[in-house]
């Protein structure tokens, strides 16, 4: 059986790392629309514990998860799980595959 890796998204909340499609900033209009659509459809999970949303995580199940942890931090945690350690100044978008 394949072991699933759990990714800490803050305040004791964890998600299955292999099911993540994207980790995006909540500031853009398309992300706000996606969040609103997920809320209407009952697919929005708020894991911010009442704090400001700093990242939006899109899952393979089409759920949208709100986190109070910065996108860069979540990306670094994800990379660490997968054995690709990123430095604080590394942009995950520019990392070689």
UniProtKB/Swiss-Prot annotation:
Matches recorded under InterPro entries: RemA-like
Family: Belongs to the RemA family.
Record's protein name: Putative regulatory protein Dole_1911
Origin species: Desulfosudis oleivorans (strain DSM 6200 / JCM 39069 / Hxd3) (Desulfococcus oleovorans)
């Amino acid at each position: 059986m394949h072991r699933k890796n759990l990714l800490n998204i803050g305040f004791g909340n964890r998600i299955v790392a292999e099911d993540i499609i994207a980790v995006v900033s909540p500031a853009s209009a398309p992300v706000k629309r996606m969040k609103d659509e997920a809320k209407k459809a009952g697919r929005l999970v708020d894991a911010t514990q009442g704090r400001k949303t700093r990242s939006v995580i899109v899952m393979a199940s089409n759920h949208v998860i709100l986190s109070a942890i910065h996108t860069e931090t979540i990306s670094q945690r994800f990379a660490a799980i997968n054995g690709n350690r990123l430095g604080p100044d590394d942009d995950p978008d520019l990392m070689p595959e």
